[in-house]
Curated annotation (Swiss-Prot):
Pfam families: DUF2129. Its main location: cytoplasm. It comes from the Bacteria. It comes from Geobacillus thermodenitrificans (strain NG80-2). It is found in: Cytoplasm. InterPro entries: DUF2129. Coiled coil: none annotated. Keywords: Cytoplasm. The keyword Cytoplasm applies. Belongs to the UPF0298 family. NCBIfam families: PRK02886.1. GO terms for cellular component: cytoplasm. This is UPF0298 protein GTNG_0961.
Amino acid sequence: MFPKRQGIIVWLHSLKYGKQLRKFGNIHYISKRLKYAVLYCDMEQVDHVMKKLAALPFVKRVEPSYRPFLRLEFESKGEKEKDSPYPLG
């Protein structure tokens, strides 16, 4: 239903070119202090967009976001850890 999206972190030399990143995807965040932008595009186009962004003269570095590949379901604590002989508080 929804297309798979992936974030791309773009490190910039100057922020005045931040608006030019709109044509590569949806800009999610721009950090003025650290001079980077986070933009999202379709997963199928990530490699193509990263190559185009890296070729721009105002871009220092381009990194993909690894969030889609991380496991976000966490397991609960085991029974041993729940029944501690030393109560806290």
